[in-house]
Amino acid sequence: MASLLARHTKMPVVTVEDEMELAADTVFLIPPATIMTLEGRHLRLAPKDRRVLSLPIDAFFTSMAAGFGSRAVAVVLSGTGSDGTRGVGAVHAAGGVAIAQDPRDARFDGMPRSAIATGFIDSALGIERIGPWIADYLIRRPRLGQLTGAERPDGATGVAVDDDRVAVGQFDGLEPAEALGRIVEILSLSGEVNFLDYKPGTVQRRIERRMGVRQVPDLTSYLELLTHDRTELASLRREMLIPVTSFFRDPDSFAELAEKVIDPLVAQAAVGSTLRVWTAGCATGEEAYTLAMLFFDAFERAGRWPTLKIFATDVEPMNIETAAAGFFAETIAADLPTTFLERFFTTRGGQYTIRPEIRQTIVFARHNLLSDPPFTRMDLVTCRNTLIYFRPEAQERALRRMHYAVRTGGYLFLGGSEALVQVQDDFSVLSARHRIWQALRPGAAPLTDRRAGLYVTPRPPATRRDNAPVTAVERGFATLSRTYAPPPALLVNSHHEILHSYGEVSRFMQMREGAASLEIGRMLVEPLLPVASALLFKSARLGEEAASDSIPIAEGILGPDPMRLRLRVVPVKQGTDSDEGRLYILAFEPDEGPDDGISGIDIDREVGARIEMLEAELAMTRESLQAMIEELETSNEELQATNEEMMASNEELQSANEELQSVNEELNSLNAEYQEKIDLLNRSNADLDSLTEIMAMSTIFVDSELTVTRFSPDAAELFRIRDVDVGRPLGDLTHRLDYPALLDDLRRTLQGQSRTEREVSGLNGRHYLVRMLPYRVPSSAAQGAVVTFVDITQTRNLQLLQAVIDGLAEHVAVLDGHGDILLVNAAWTRFAADNGDPGLAHTGVGTNYVGRCDIGEAAIDSGYAKRAVEGIRSVLTGKQRHFTMEYPCDAPGQPRWFVMHARPLDGARGGAVVSHIEITRWHNQTEASPETSSGGLPGSDGTGADGGAPRA
């Protein structure tokens, strides 16, 4: 590959080595069978783990996004498979740019198509256009914080988004901060997400990125673009709501959830019961499916199978569609345990599909966590890495809604950077590290969103008004008491809602199926209902008392017997004439006599009038409803924009959290690697220290500046050096050597990179062999040298001893305590060479001299040999201090005589010195003239034994 690329570029093409630093205008190639990541400006290599799916492009893109954020540019070119798909998501989430080769232009379109399908690709281009596009983007990329001079997109006044009402240049002169505010407002009005609930930093970075992609120089120009280009508005909205999720995100947290929440829930579930779970902000569904798999795993382990229902919600419809489909790229294999992949997925066409039994337990629905009503009676509520995108007040609203949703004793599971804060007193902590809580008490019903009044005016609920004034009740009872012998009666308001009851009215009441209400239309028995409604309507219209004709009641309705009943409505006098404040008494009178003259009610006429009025009200209601529908459509658009803004903030903070998590994981891995290197270094140091101690030689290490880097304990005998001297120049230290050229020799060794040896003497009378050896630190330019001082005094003494005995005419050998020869002199060596043993194989160092004398008995008079052996042994064993004897040792045709002396070596090792001197001339003279031999044998001190022994 390197040679292939080199033919098409003038830039150097290099294959990466570990810790290689980035360089401009250079092409770096990843070596085979490795994973390459980026740490700062250095490339790190690691071997592939063949036990798991290898995705080197994803790994590199992710590390690049973590390190460079919005400065990262990812390009996916021709290739098979889906490697790079997850990585472009990480780059996009960090604010970087992702580009793919146009699949139509690619020889293998698998990787580009997979990346484009994520929605994270900013542009799909032909191969020849990618380079110029990136260069132009980097030149024109704006810096939003510098453009606005502000940090908050607040205070915008609103702007119309109808293309027909916006003219090019209409925003000229607008301040950048105001332009940013209008952009956020337009964005919020484009859907059901209010982006004012999102943290401003997220919004700013996303707008900056889109401005860079569209190459727009300033905010006012981008505002005009948004008002004219609905496609760009949709792209910006998608930018804010890009989902960032994965299976088993934070595996340790899910393991803790399974142990402390899921297993107990399964164990406590009754037969036939249902476990209810709500996962809010589910994105593309990975978290919901993770929970379902964990519950199924717990079911199998416990042998219990309660019904499981998971409600997975998200504000973005596209995310819900993706999640509901249940199709996932092959890259998820890196996130899931192998057993779960095999149990809960099927593979087809390079994709993983969730199994039907898992899919059927999950209901995916669009839901706005901040505005839509929450679910109820949940055993578990999860909302991970969503709150971190919200402003604090929005976080509180979301938390209170989730508190209302979870039952007492249920569980709440949040993301790693999220906390309860405002509702923490209502929960107990199960795992602070993994953000798991248990509800202690039920939550209050969430209040209507503070912005709801801008869009919807809710109708007052038809429920009991607990705050009805007591004085009105009393006035109603007083009116009834003055007029009648009090019959059973009800006090109702202008909405026909019951406020109070007088007497026994239960037989006239009947609770109907459906929503609870105190409206008489939901409470009176059927025969009385139309009459009571007509009477109340007439009394309200005329402002006077109204009574019905006698109403026949069949048996079994109000009692066992048939009866007749008359209804009467009496207005209650109050201090206000408003319709809303009017109260009425509805009395139930038994019909026991003729009409009392009070005007009755013509049911047909009153019903007709009522119908006319209701038709008029219906027409007005329709007009009002149409206006409300239009208002709701506008409100829905604003809410959608708000939801999109929140989702984008969620994604941005989640991306930041993912980056931090990735950095944390990389730091943990790096820490483990460093710890391993430290352990190895400690072992190496211990080995080196032990080696220098056992070698018992003075050793000093210096760097290229001749500064001491370390030394052995023995070096303190020659140099006045201590631990505090590490880091000092060697020349500053005094030493006990006659070696003025020490520093010069070290410099020559470093410059020539060659070994240096020299013998020097010490001021203490000892001698040393100095060895200098240069070295280089691997993968570094650092160099140094090590110098050792070997004490060779004993060797020099031995050499001196050898020179002394070599100067003697006698044949000298030194024996150890066993009779083995340790040392011979030159005369001994010459004699052996002249007498058949030139290589000293039989009489040289290492041979046993006593043994050689025993062997010689066959060739020489055994008496001499025997006495020689006994004499030498007596000296070796300490029985004699000196042994001497004369013996013949003839050469061919020449008789010769020798004298042998043996003296012990003093010391713990023992041994002896044996010397042989030729005395042939002396012996001949002695035999010729005995009187001339009075001086004794040559070399004898006159105390030795007589006799001779063969020379071995």
Curated annotation (Swiss-Prot):
GO terms for biological process: chemotaxis. One of its GO terms (cellular component) is cytoplasm. Disulfide bonds: none annotated. It comes from the Bacteria. InterPro entries: Bact_Chemotaxis_MeTrfase, CheB_C, CheR_C, CheR_MeTrfase, CheR_N, PAS, PAS-like_dom_sf, PAS_4. Signal peptide: none annotated. CDD domains: CheB-CheR_fusion, PAS. Residues 936-952 have a biased composition (Gly residues). Residues 168-440 form the CheR-type methyltransferase domain. GO terms for molecular function: phosphorelay response regulator activity; protein-glutamate methylesterase activity; S-adenosylmethionine-dependent methyltransferase activity. SMART domains: MeTrc, PAS. Residues 923-952 are annotated as: Disordered. PROSITE patterns: CHEB (PS50122), CHER (PS50123). Residues 1-141 form the CheB-type methylesterase domain. Residues 923-935 have a biased composition (Polar residues). This is Uncharacterized 104.1 kDa protein in hypE 3'region. It comes from Rhodobacter capsulatus.
